[in-house]
Amino acid sequence: MGPAPAGEQLRGATGEPEVMEPALEGTGKEGKKASSRKRTLAEPPAKGLLQPVKLSRAELYKEPTNEELNRLRETEILFHSSLLRLQVEELLKEVRLSEKKKDRIDAFLREVNQRVVRVPSVPETELTDQAWLPAGVRVPLHQVPYAVKGCFRFLPPAQVTVVGSYLLGTCIRPDINVDVALTMPREILQDKDGLNQRYFRKRALYLAHLAHHLAQDPLFGSVCFSYTNGCHLKPSLLLRPRGKDERLVTVRLHPCPPPDFFRPCRLLPTKNNVRSAWYRGQSPAGDGSPEPPTPRYNTWVLQDTVLESHLQLLSTILSSAQGLKDGVALLKVWLRQRELDKGQGGFTGFLVSMLVVFLVSTRKIHTTMSGYQVLRSVLQFLATTDLTVNGISLCLSSDPSLPALADFHQAFSVVFLDSSGHLNLCADVTASTYHQVQHEARLSMMLLDSRADDGFHLLLMTPKPMIRAFDHVLHLRPLSRLQAACHRLKLWPELQDNGGDYVSAALGPLTTLLEQGLGARLNLLAHSRPPVPEWDISQDPPKHKDSGTLTLGLLLRPEGLTSVLELGPEADQPEAAKFRQFWGSRSELRRFQDGAIREAVVWEAASMSQKRLIPHQVVTHLLALHADIPETCVHYVGGPLDALIQGLKETSSTGEEALVAAVRCYDDLSRLLWGLEGLPLTVSAVQGAHPVLRYTEVFPPTPVRPAFSFYETLRERSSLLPRLDKPCPAYVEPMTVVCHLEGSGQWPQDAEAVQRVRAAFQLRLAELLTQQHGLQCRATATHTDVLKDGFVFRIRVAYQREPQILKEVQSPEGMISLRDTAASLRLERDTRQLPLLTSALHGLQQQHPAFSGVARLAKRWVRAQLLGEGFADESLDLVAAALFLHPEPFTPPSSPQVGFLRFLFLVSTFDWKNNPLFVNLNNELTVEEQVEIRSGFLAARAQLPVMVIVTPQDRKNSVWTQDGPSAQILQQLVVLAAEALPMLEKQLMDPRGPGDIRTVFRPPLDIYDVLIRLSPRHIPRHRQAVDSPAASFCRGLLSQPGPSSLMPVLGYDPPQLYLTQLREAFGDLALFFYDQHGGEVIGVLWKPTSFQPQPFKASSTKGRMVMSRGGELVMVPNVEAILEDFAVLGEGLVQTVEARSERWTV
């Protein structure tokens, strides 16, 4: 595939986007006004095709210079293509700081330094005596318990040092943060400050005093507090310049102790530095018991002692190797696009920088490598190395006094030691986050190894927000409920270690609990904790419950997702007690067919949509049982969109069962056709050619049982007819089946004669099905309708050579040549290509059970926007199929919800002008063939449709988009998808609930010039509307199943018939838009040329009136008469015709 760079965003930690240059006009821009939407539909497409560069012969054959030869050699060695090199260089140019901005930042840093060292000192007081603090500033730390020993005085910092990525040249836009370490004078600190948060209290008081004085300085436009990497014990002070440079940079001040002040041996992961008697007012478990270790607390102290040494290490390795710096910058972009560096416990840019240093030290990366090679090497390492099992270390020392890796593994989920051997750099990274990093690295390596043309774009330019990357998400709120979870899970040591942060304390145990419970249903569980927002220095720091929402993402495994049974051990095994303890009251003894008696859990789920939501039952049950988190605190987002494709009667089903029943009935009919006796030629193939038979019909049919009293009966044809005094009967669409007959010399060679023979076969087919199987049939010259088990099938007899016969053209000299005609192309599409497509998509559904739901939601949305008739049904099915066959950079969707979001993203960002959409069914197209097809596409672009979809069976012509959409309709769809996607994602990620999920399905009616409102009485699919009516009309169907001997009314849809008449009569003046699924409104847009005066012609006065302008007779639309004709044509169906005259003038 080849998505356009349009609408893509590189998001920083604060979520502010830096929009890359758009390539497709009008894409991804929110807040489009109605007038712009109207222009989109009405105006011709903008010129935007990529044109080949033409060179003169001399330029084409000019010898390369030495510089060009060197560059080519470098490209061959360091990159796998020159295109990739250009893309990498352009991206780095985009995210790097310019020299001008660096100079302005340097100047600001010098000003900050001068002001910090001039802050006045404060005399010594007790730590608990904070009366000296001015009224306008609050201590940025929760002082619980408040009582703590020690004294504090303020002295200006002994040293001010810039640390972090700014000096290294690896920081990336748009959010430039410069970290500054303030070394506190030794006189402020005391020997036992490592105990009971004393150091952290002093650190916070130091910042509070600084904040008070710096806030009064006119240099700063903003002075506020923030948490360092989300750690609530380690606030930092943020400074931003005043005026035009306000967004240029954020300087973060980090107080730290003097070098070697804290002894590392006291801060080992096995040591305790928060006494239970101080923190809880009691010893841990009675007299004489050991204090629990506080590894995370110890790590947070240690982190402040190594800021400068880490900078020196990074500088030594990176400073002389531009390729390493480029690699770090690319890795930071990679993390940012996947939101892996956000919030507490994120996999930060600092960690990947240190990982590069580790790989250099172990000779897995060489300093001469390019940024792309560094990126590949790091991703390869992450994909194949599990730091939760085998930690790594930068420490080269063999000192026996150093702690062992095993000690760190016992204390932390992920282990990566720094060069001192005392500090775990990944102390804050949870196992879930690291496994997510591993998962993303594996996907990225597969993408890079495929060498796809758009691999760079998918890897580094495509955002992967949680709601679009995971099948289901769940929000836990309020966070204060996690306090109860800590009590239930007995997490007192963890609370003590985390300084009371019950969210961090409970996070690991909760994710482990859910991973165990979801088992084979789960591929990956990830969590997202949004960064705690900054706060004003005059405010108290945010409480733990105010730190946003804890959101968990579930990447599901389709193989085990829909199983209703959790099978436990046999009753007499010792593991049975553990199983019962884990599942609680849901576990029960069951006897199975093999005679075994086992513990088991059975979940309640009747329909496929309910089975997809079994993880919801698992999550809520386990959280309530083990963590005391009630269901009311768990907002699970897995199926809110299911309501849009739910059947009319089975409100709990999204139609999969009805589709399976229809396909099963089709299979039975196929067997009957294969076994028919008495046909002059045998059946060679029976193929489905209808959306139902590829599982993509939005509202699948159900068996029809007509109430005969509701209809008129046509006895001689055993058929029913609608009655004028009754509401419109239920809509019944026959399912097309193509029946191929064997070739024979008896077939005529004349096209008209072939059609007559086919008509005879249609009649004979009906006779034999009625005689041999008692089926109700109705034959015509082109098809035979068959009623079987309440379903209606339309069988079309096909002869394989007929398309070729239709292509034959005879010259006056008697020479026969083959030439495509409209009739031959249509017949080939309907009898060969459509059955092949239906068969391929049927197979895709067997492979990916979510395909049906995704395709149906996609079509439901397109039709709800009143644009359905601009797109062939098959074209939308293929776009949905592309999400499963080419899911990069994601995995194939396992839920309709995430698939629909990706559909909106694909539609709104794909570069339809310059790329064909590849849908490689059955993986038949090789990479070389795709390159060849792309070249042919660019060469013939002007002759191809605006939307080109390539499949293995349709490599050049894009059969399914030949008749639409137009450029204007496609652009309107792109605009609507770009507006709907962020709105829907915001709704689904709202922890209070998604609100009205149907909002994005409601069409924007304000863009239309005329609205024709229809009577629900004559809308047969009224109940399928986006806003389903509370009550509708009886449609003449019996609720109880039973045999039917009469053919129901087929394909009778008055709004569609009315639309056909409108287009025939007024298609030259206006465009008509309608939602076939129960829409009550037809939108009318006048064409731009409609109101231009036309020369008077007696032959074209329809809908126009004659006027005199400039002495000449001209014709202009007679709007009043046209609107009256709208109502007359639709008499009985049309309720009102609303002319929105403010939108147009004659």
From Swiss-Prot:
Gene Ontology molecular function, alphabetical: RNA binding
List the gene name: NOL6
The UniProt entry lists the main location of this chain as nucleus
Gene Ontology BP annotations? ribosomal small subunit biogenesis; rRNA processing; tRNA export from nucleus
Keywords recorded for this protein, A-Z: Chromosome, Coiled coil, Nucleus, Phosphoprotein, RNA-binding
Q: Where is this region: Disordered?
A: 1-48
Query: How is this protein annotated for GO cellular component?
Result: condensed nuclear chromosome; CURI complex; mitochondrion; nucleolus; nucleoplasm; small-subunit processome; UTP-C complex
State whether it acts alone or in a complex, and with which partners, per the record: Part of the small subunit (SSU) processome, composed of more than 70 proteins and the RNA chaperone small nucleolar RNA (snoRNA) U3. Interacts with RRP7A; required for NOL6 localization to nucleolus.
State the family named in the UniProt similarity comment for this chain: Belongs to the NRAP family.
Record bears the keyword S-adenosyl-L-methionine: no
Identification of the protein by name: Nucleolar protein 6
Specify the species: Homo sapiens (Human)
Described purpose of this protein according to its UniProt entry: Part of the small subunit (SSU) processome, first precursor of the small eukaryotic ribosomal subunit. During the assembly of the SSU processome in the nucleolus, many ribosome biogenesis factors, an RNA chaperone and ribosomal proteins associate with the nascent pre-rRNA and work in concert to generate RNA folding, modifications, rearrangements and cleavage as well as targeted degradation of pre-ribosomal RNA by the RNA exosome.
Membrane-crossing ranges are none
